[in-house]
């Protein structure tokens, strides 16, 4: 519905869009995230498509607007507040990307990055392709594969400067998903909650088996939110043995570092 206010055409829908874009810009600024002037508008279009597609398929359980902005876009971009985590011009893979977090916001914020978004469900990749088309994104490639299977592809294995995941999985499982994709001398980065402290022992053992070493978790505070995430880098020190990752489903059922089975 379009209304005439003071001789000017006013669309309530346009007003809501402007408020959302302003909220995105405000939250990025409050969190100290570096961004270009066009990023809030790009994130807004992403947000609109996410809401549209979420009505017909399960992409996110978080639907309250302020919470979506913080949990999806801001949380994904908090890695940019720590410059050494994602170097200029890096190749980056987001394993199990789902609706694109954290990899797609990072790609939108950093045109210098070469980003691969990998997921096991084609319908999620169809959504992501719609976002890429709508925004004419040129620095993102989509790959349809499970984490364990993708890491056995010659063109994917140990080819990336950074591998990331925001999946809800124990640290030893994430290590087995991510480290096989990472070049020696580079890193994986896991988005984790405070409960990761209980996973560090097994996580260190798993990382060692996979050629990696855990660094100290980095707290990233999002103002006004009770929940907080930690960013946990894992340095890739040596090549990952050929038997890793194990066959699809095994890392989750029998995590490294928590069992004698390898």
Question: What are these language model-derived features?
Answer:
Residues 50, 106, 192, 234:
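Residue-level signal for inorganic ion chemistry
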Residues 201-262:
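SAM/dcSAM-binding transferase cores
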Residues 37, 63, 144-146, 216-218:
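Short loop/edge segments at beta-strand edges and connector loops
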Residues 124-126, 196, 200:
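Short alpha-helix immediately C-terminal to the canonical SAM-binding loop
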Residues 182-184:
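Helix-to-beta-strand junctions that scaffold the AdoMet/dcAdoMet cofactor pocket
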Residues 161-173, 180, 190, 194:
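A short SAM/SAH-binding and catalytic strip from SAM-dependent methyltransferases
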Residues 2-5, 9-89, 93, 123-140:
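Class I SAM-dependent transferase core
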Residues 77-167, 175-176:
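Conserved SAM/SAH cofactor-binding pocket of Class I
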